[in-house]
Each structure stands twice: as C-alpha cells, then as structure tokens.
C-alpha cells in the first residue's frame, strides 16, 4: 500500500500490477533470467498487448524461451537501453520482434507522464535517487495513485498476478488462448459504455473526420540509436523483424515514406513490416480496443503475414 509504484521494496510478484510497466517488466526479467535463460524478445509499448508471444514461439527454433519487454510509452531509446543491457551481460539475443509506434517511439517523455515511462535505473544507468524523486513528484501530484494502490491491495486476497509471470504477456492466461484461428473480432467491446460512445461519435460516425497528416519523426540522433541497435544485432547474429504497428487510422498517422526508408536502410527492407498504413486494418474500428491499441486478432494476423508465407525465425520455410 505504501509502495504504489512497486519500486521501494524488493521485487515480488505479490500484487504485481501495471503501475509502472517498464520497471516491473525489466525487474521480472532480471528475477527470471537465471531460471529461464531467455533468448528471444519482443520489445514494445502498450500496443504489444495485441501480440501473443506464445504464438510467436511457434515460429522460433525448438527450445527457445521468449520474453515480452513492455513499457508504457516505450521509445526507441528505451528499447536500446534494454538491448544494451542484454549485450552487456552477454546474454543470448537470438530472436527479436521490435515494435515501432508512430510517432511515439521517437518522442521524448514530458514530465506529466514521466512516471509512467521513466526507465529502470538498472538499465538506464540514471541515479536511482533521480528515479525515485520523479515517482515521488508524481505521487504528490496524483494522490489517486495511493488510493488506487489501496484498492488493489484490498482486492488482492489471495494475491493475484495480472501478467504472465514467465513470458510477461499482457494476460496471465495468454498461453492458453486458442491459437489455431484469430480471436473474435470487435475489440471495442472492452471499452466502457461512455468511452465507446465518445469514440464512435468523434471518429466512426463523424462524416467530417479526416485522416491525420503524417510527419517525419526520425532525426539524426534517432538514426544513430537505430544504428547502435543494428550493431548489437550483428554482433549477436540476431534474427529480427521490425514491425511498424497499426493504430486507428482516423486518429493516428501512418509512417512517412522518408522514415520508412530510414528503417529499411538500417535494418534491411526484408526485415521491416509496415502495418501503419494498412487501411484494411487501421480503418476498421473493431480491430482496436481503443484508438491506440490493436486487438489480439490483429496481432495474430501480423504474425501470420510475417511468418506464414515466408521463413520462420529458425531459417526454415514456414508451413
């Protein structure tokens, strides 16, 4: 109750929730690695909740162990820090899915939302006192966080774990989903009645809404970060795929041609998959649980398109 961000006391799966997803994801990795020896990773923001890593496992070499590195508002800099940590400790980095959100992945967090996106000092090498001061500032500004922690504590008898304690998948039961066909569509059903009404009113039923303008967001400094990631991949012989994620097309822009060319120049055109401009996905509101988050049916479709008709990540022809 006195630790709403789960950063003061030693890490434990007890009352594990989504208060600070970056910190909890990375600490779960540190705690689990000696037992599970991960070698395959998904790096993503909250949009990664639409990816089921147990389905991805079907395309990985036998014996692979996968982990979802997820952070709210994840940036390419945050992904680079996690990849650098794995490289520093000489852990295997055999297979990677790197999800890129436009424009979020190339943004710089601002103070009002910094508590949700601030990086684990174990990975960022930032002084821990700075990390805790940011959380304290946020706590003072938002007393609702304390009340939220109290409510979660009262409901957690016995203690519950929201996320899969091994893979860190969005839901603990993700591995038990039927993977033989896409989940049922209409992810909007998960929205509350008011939120759904507002979304339908502002976007779906609005005849005057226009597609947002796409703007280039990858500058020289971000390109250097991308090249550093590629260098780590080359040292490890990593088999990787870069996925530009979809969002609801009448709210979020697709990637520009210039930015897409930069990604392709760094990682290879054959390794970059752009779903942000796929109107068959992005203009169907039922594919999203809200304008920013695609559903499991779309994650299923993306993995199928990337691997089913091409090569799996072990270099063998997929079925």
What does each of the following model-derived ranges do?
Residues 44, 98-103, 244-247, 275-278:
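Short loop/turn segments at strand-loop or loop-helix junctions that form parts
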Residues 81-82, 223-229, 256-261:
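Alpha-helical scaffolding within the catalytic cores
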Residues 36-134:
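Membrane-embedded segments
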Residues 253-319:
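C-terminal regions of proteins
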Residues 100, 113-228, 232-236, 319:
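Secreted/periplasmic serine-hydrolase-like ester/acetyl group-modifying domain
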Residues 238-242:
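A contiguous, surface-oriented mixed alpha/beta subdomain in the mid-to-C-terminal portion of proteins
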Residues 1-37, 89, 319:
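N-terminal secretory targeting modules
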Residues 73-77, 216-222, 248-255:
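Acidic-and-aromatic substrate-binding clefts and catalytic sites of carbohydrate-active enzymes
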């Amino acid at each position: 109750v006195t630790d709403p961000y789960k950063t003061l006391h030693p890490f434990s799966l007890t009352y594990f929730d989504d208060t600070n997803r970056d910190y909890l994801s990375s600490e779960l990795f540190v705690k689990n690695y000696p037992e599970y020896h991960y070698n395959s990773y998904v790096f993503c923001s909250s949009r990664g909740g639409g990816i089921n890593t147990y389905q991805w496992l079907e395309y990985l070499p036998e014996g692979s162990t996968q982990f979802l590195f997820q952070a709210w508002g994840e940036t390419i800099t945050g992904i680079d820090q996690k990849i650098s940590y794995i490289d520093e400790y000489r852990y295997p980095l055999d297979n990677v899915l790197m999800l890129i959100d436009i424009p979020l992945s190339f943004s710089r967090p601002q103070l009002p939302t910094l508590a949700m996106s601030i990086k684990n000092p174990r990975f960022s090498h930032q002084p821990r006192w700075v990390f805790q001061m940011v959380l304290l500032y946020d706590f003072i500004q938002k007393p609702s966080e304390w009340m939220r922690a109290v409510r979660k504590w009262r409901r957690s008898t016995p203690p519950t774990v929201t996320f899969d304690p091994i893979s860190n998948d969005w839901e603990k039961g993700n591995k038990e989903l039927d993977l033989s066909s896409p989940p049922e569509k209409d992810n909007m059903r998960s929205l509350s009645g008011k939120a759904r009404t507002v979304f339908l009113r502002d976007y779906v039923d609005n005849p005057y809404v226009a597609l947002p303008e796409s703007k280039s967001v990858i500058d020289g400094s971000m390109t250097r970060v991308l090249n550093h990631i590629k260098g780590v991949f080359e040292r490890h012989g990593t088999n990787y795929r870069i996925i530009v994620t979809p969002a609801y097309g009448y709210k979020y822009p697709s990637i520009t041609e210039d930015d897409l060319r930069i990604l392709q120049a760094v990682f290879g055109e054959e390794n970059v998959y752009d779903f942000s401009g796929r109107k068959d996905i992005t203009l169907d509101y039922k594919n999203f649980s809200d304008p920013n988050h695609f559903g499991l049916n779309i994650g299923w479709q993306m993995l199928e398109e990337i691997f089913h008709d091409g090569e799996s990540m072990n270099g063998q022809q997929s079925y």
